[in-house]
């Protein structure tokens, strides 16, 4: 069962690319926290893909991966705003966010670090994630790296996925400024619920037996 995984960090355009692929007819989950959500979706973006891409690569062989880049001077302040808003809900014991999302953010951003919101810390997290992605996919043809703000980036994505695209198409610009929930407000029949329940109810994957 092959998938398309969007493994860029939050605030790099994960919502915009998710909406663009929805409009192409894909079933898309922007965040997925159950096995069934992954089974239903053709495309999965954001958490936990940006932290779990190695495990997902093993669970879904022959899938494609898209890493999203963003100019650091724009990404850092955007991420600072996001983490400021999310922080109370990411707390291990009292935060109400899904445990998979909490783990994904903790693993990537070291939420307990006293310097969490500083430019230096976030830049270091960005660089570490980028380097790890580049190292893991080195020499492989199943990873595409794009900056969705760059001209022609949508055409590059469609070519990578084997889709037709005209030169006048562009990525939608969503979640700009302080907005963080445009995905919830976007109505589309192909959206997949992040908490979709199947035969295993709302169980997530067990990574313990994977050779990582």
Predicted regions and their residues:
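PAPS-dependent sulfotransferase catalytic domain
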Residues: 1-122, 132, 138-139, 152-163
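C-terminal/domain-terminus segments
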Residues: 143-179
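PAPS-dependent sulfotransferase catalytic core
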Residues: 47, 106-109, 165-212
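Active-site oxyanion/phosphate-handling segment shared across diverse enzymes
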Residues: 119-148
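A short, terminal or domain-edge coil/loop segment
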Residues: 84-92, 125, 129-132, 197-210
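Short, contiguous clusters of charged residues that form electrostatic/catalytic patches at enzyme active sites
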Residues: 51, 127-131, 155
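Short beta->alpha linker loops
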Residues: 48, 70, 128, 148-152
